[in-house]
Amino acid sequence: MATFARSDQLLVIIDPAARETDGESVRIAKDVLSAGAAAKVCMPDGPEEFARVLSRRGSRRPVVVGDDGALVRAVTFLHRRRELADCVLAMVPVGGALGVAHALGVPTGAVAAARAVLDGVERRMDLLVDDSDGVVLGALRIPPLAAVAQVQVPLPAKGWLRPYQHLVRSLSARPAPAPAVPGPPARLRVEVDGETVVDLDQPVEGISVTPGGPDGLAEVEVRPLSVGAEATPVRAAGRTVTVAGADFRYRADVGVAGPVRRRTWRVVEGAWGLTVPGAG
């Protein structure tokens, strides 16, 4: 793990949703970071400006102040520009959805997280990358919430953004709030490293795929539909996971995608770096 010096220059990117949700935590994060390092603070108004700021980071270490969605947006942007491997991210979690950040080892309190940015260490993280260039940091779930809508944010067609319009448009689609209603059982074929784990003749209640397992493998759990007694989950581990069958949607961290009839995810071991508290 690499350690960081307080002399590092920081680029603090404050997501607009964080400012609206918890302005006090944002203020605390700014104060702690600015007192401990040379920090340039940016407050983008939306996803396109968020991307512009991140693309112009130079040698500064990016610090995302926001929720899980902001972290996923930053990782996705850097991945699609093929700059993720060489850019160590840091995060101060502020907002409603913080489960991914917490699971990755980021402290949930503003003060503790800001101090980890200043004094923490780099931890290399595995990443799931699908065949449409989407990413999963924490967990993939099938099926997701039952009802999800997405709203596209209009983008300007001039200036610096032209080369990145398609990328920023895809990152700016946000799912609308939806009730936590489980979907119906699905008939899906699940393959792990080319071996069939569950076939179409076995309805399933849910599938989860999580990166970060031993030896750079993804951990897969399939929950078959049961009548009466609860069925034992089927577990496997591998570097590629393919799901195919009738149209299905899936939740990747905080975003919902689909419907698709086939999707393959592969593990990229140590794909990105995240600043977390040191062992001491």
In which residue ranges do the predicted regions lie?
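Short solvent-exposed loop/turn micro-motifs enriched in small/polar/acidic residues
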Residues: 57, 120-122, 181-183, 234-236, ...
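Soluble catalytic domains of membrane acyltransferases
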Residues: 49-55, 76, 80, 130-131
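ATP/nucleoside-binding phosphotransfer catalytic cores, i.e., glycine-rich phosphate-binding loops
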Residues: 201-280
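Short Gly/Thr/Asp-enriched flexible loops that form oxyanion-binding sites at enzyme active sites
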Residues: 69-83
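Catalytic core of DAGKc-family lipid kinases
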Residues: 83-207, 211
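Hydrophobic alpha-helical membrane segments, chiefly transmembrane helices and signal peptide h-regions
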Residues: 11-14, 63-67, 74-75, 89-94, ...
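ATP/NTP phosphate-donor binding region
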Residues: 1-65, 72, 111-115, 274, ...
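Short, glycine/charged-enriched secondary-structure capping and boundary segments
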Residues: 26-28, 77-80, 104-107
